[in-house]
Amino acid sequence: MSTISYTAVGRRKEATAKVKLQPGTGIITVNKKPGETYFNYNSEYLSTLRGPLLALGLENDYDLHITAKGGGIKGQTDAVKLGLARAICTMSSEKRESLKPHGYLTRDYRAKERKKYGLRKARKAPQFSKR
């Protein structure tokens, strides 16, 4: 007998997170570590990734099994948030209407701008010398 699970992928900058949502007691596991340990007990990160569940009042009804790769912790947190919102939408399409106004289903497309030739960074030019 297999348990019901919902899976989705979220991305932000260079970070990618696969989120698996299963009925449970609210345990968060990131890369086989407890969520609090992985995010260094930072309450801001933990509340950000729990956002979609808190908006629907489901924070203690589902366990999260997350695989996060790339980027930094902040990017991974936002990737998890998007993946979680998408997983909730696959669970029930009625929940989409309550997640959409909060912005949980919107992917933040901003990424690092590429370096251009003749410049030191993406936009930083070498110092101009008149003579």
From Swiss-Prot:
InterPro entries: Ribosomal_Su5_D2-typ_SF (IPR020568), Ribosomal_uS9 (IPR000754), Ribosomal_uS9_bac/plastid (IPR023035), Ribosomal_uS9_CS (IPR020574), Ribsml_uS5_D2-typ_fold_subgr (IPR014721)
Protein family: Belongs to the universal ribosomal protein uS9 family.
Keyword terms of this UniProt record: Chloroplast, Plastid, Ribonucleoprotein, Ribosomal protein
Top-level taxonomic group: Eukaryota
MF-aspect GO terms: RNA binding; structural constituent of ribosome
One Pfam family this sequence matches: Ribosomal_S9
Gene Ontology annotations for the cellular component aspect, listed alphabetically: chloroplast; cytosolic small ribosomal subunit
Organism: Emiliania huxleyi
Localization per record: Plastid, Chloroplast
Secreted is among the record's keywords: no
GO term, biological process aspect, one: translation
Spans traversing the lipid bilayer: none
Protein name according to UniProt: Small ribosomal subunit protein uS9c
Gene3D superfamilies for the chain: 3.30.230.10
